[in-house]
Each structure stands twice: as C-alpha cells, then as structure tokens.
C-alpha cells in the first residue's frame, strides 16, 4: 500500500505477538491477551517486544547468543529494496524490516530459553557421566555389602530350613510309628475278637448238633412208640372185628332159630 494508506497488521496467536504498523512511524506491540503467564517487554529502537512465560513451569537461565552476534536467516537489505519497489519509501521499508528483525530475535529468544549450547550440553553430559560413575561405584559397594548380607541370610535360612526339615522328618517318623502301632493293636484286637466269635460259633454249633441228636433220638423213640401203639390198636381192632363178626353170626343164627321156631309153631 502507498502514501497515507500505509498499514500493516501482523497477528500471532498464543505465545506469538500482535504487530500493528501505522503511518507516521507509530509502532505498537501488544502481548496476546489469551495466554496465561507473565509478559516481559524490552524496548529496542522505538519498538516494544513482549514474550509470555507460562506460569507454573520451571525457568532456568541459559546463555543466549548476543544480538550483535546473531545472523538473520534473510537478507534485510534485499527486503528493504523489495519493499521500496512496492511503493514504500526507504524509512518505512527500514522500519518494517527492523520490526521483522526484532520479532525474529524475540522468537529466537523464546526458543533459546528452552535450549542449551553445545558446550553446556557437553558439560552436562560429563557431569551426568560422572554421576553415573559415582552411582556405579556406589552400586558395586552396595552390591557387595548386600550380597554378603544376603549370603549370610541365605545360610541362616538354610540352617533354619534344615532344622525344620529334620523336625518334620522326626514328626513324620513318630506319627508313622504311632500309626503302625495303632494298626497292629487294632489288628490284634480284631483277630482276638474274630477268634472269640469263631469259638462261640463252634460252641453254638456243637450245642446245636447235640440238641439235634437228642431231638432225633427223642423223635425216633416217639416214632417207635407210635408204631407200637398203632400195631396194638390194629391188633385190638382185629380182635374186636372178630368178636363183632362172631356176635353178629350168633345173632343171625339166633334170629334164624327163633324165626324157625315161630314158623313151626305157626304151622
């Protein structure tokens, strides 16, 4: 843009900056309102720079390369010439380029706050290696002492375990012997009980056979008596039968004689 309509607006959000360029070489630099933290400002060549530091983060001091020793990543003279060819006068072009250089330096400062130089890195690495060597030595010493302690504890535990094993072995043997003794006693008791029961069974069997023999003899005698009685009864019945036949025959002959007597008398 040319003349009185000269106006540039550079807007950067978050950690970045808002840059407003107006005609009359009036340059204002405002920190972002949406970022939390503390804004630090420096004034250089009529410009205000602002960078926000996040609150709650660790802040450490680092050696930042001085401004005069830094090299910009673009050609400022060529940029001034380019702006002049687009209608800016020399003062405006230099002002814009100076503002861009200031913004670049502010961004580099922000980046450098979280970085270290090679020398600092090497020193830090050497310090870390020294700490690691010290830790390694301490670990070796601790390892030896701990191993000695562990070895002693291990030996102590071995002895205690051996005592426990021997105690368990003795208890197992004692329990096994007691169990065997109880089993033998129970076996003897059962054998005696079985023998006694068998003896009682034999006595009962003998008594039963005796009673059976006695019963058989009694039954035989009874059968003999019954047979004798039956034979006697048969003999008696035969004798009674003969007497009855004789009586009947006599009765018949008597009746016939009476009948013949009456018959003769009737004639």
UniProtKB/Swiss-Prot annotation:
Belongs to the CCDC90 family. It is found in: Mitochondrion membrane. The chain crosses the membrane at residues 244-266. The gene is ccdc90b. This is Coiled-coil domain-containing protein 90B, mitochondrial. Keywords: Coiled coil, Membrane, Mitochondrion, Transit peptide, Transmembrane, Transmembrane helix. Residues 142-175 form a coiled coil. Residues 1-47 form a transit peptide. It comes from the Eukaryota. GO terms for cellular component: mitochondrial membrane.
């Amino acid at each position: 843009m040319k003349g009185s309509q000269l106006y540039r607006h550079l807007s950067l959000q978050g950690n970045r900056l808002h840059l407003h360029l107006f005609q009359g070489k009036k340059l204002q630099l405002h920190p972002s309102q949406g970022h939390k933290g503390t804004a630090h400002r420096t004034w250089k060549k009529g410009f205000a720079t602002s960078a926000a530091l996040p609150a709650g983060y660790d802040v450490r001091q680092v050696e930042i390369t001085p401004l005069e020793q830094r090299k910009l990543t673009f050609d400022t003279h060529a940029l001034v010439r380019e702006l002049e060819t687009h209608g800016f006068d020399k003062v405006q072009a230099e002002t814009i380029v100076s503002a861009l250089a200031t913004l670049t330096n502010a961004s580099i400062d922000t980046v450098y706050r979280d970085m270290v130089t090679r020398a600092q890195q090497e020193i830090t690495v050497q310090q870390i290696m020294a700490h690691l060597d010290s830790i390694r030595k301490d670990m070796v010493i601790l390892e030896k002492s701990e191993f000695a302690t562990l070895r002693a504890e291990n030996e102590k535990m071995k002895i205690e375990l051996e005592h426990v094993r021997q105690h368990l072995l003795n208890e197992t043997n004692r329990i096994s012997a007691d169990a065997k003794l109880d089993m033998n006693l129970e076996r003897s008791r059962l054998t005696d009980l079985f023998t006694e029961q068998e003896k009682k069974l034999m006595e009962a069997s003998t008594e039963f056979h005796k009673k059976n023999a006695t019963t058989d003899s009694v039954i035989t005698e009874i059968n003999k008596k019954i047979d004798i009685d039956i034979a006697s009864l048969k003999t008696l019945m035969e004798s009674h039968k003969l007497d009855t036949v004789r009586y009947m025959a006599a009765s018949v002959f008597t009746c016939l004689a009476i009948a013949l007597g009456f018959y003769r008398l009737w004639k």
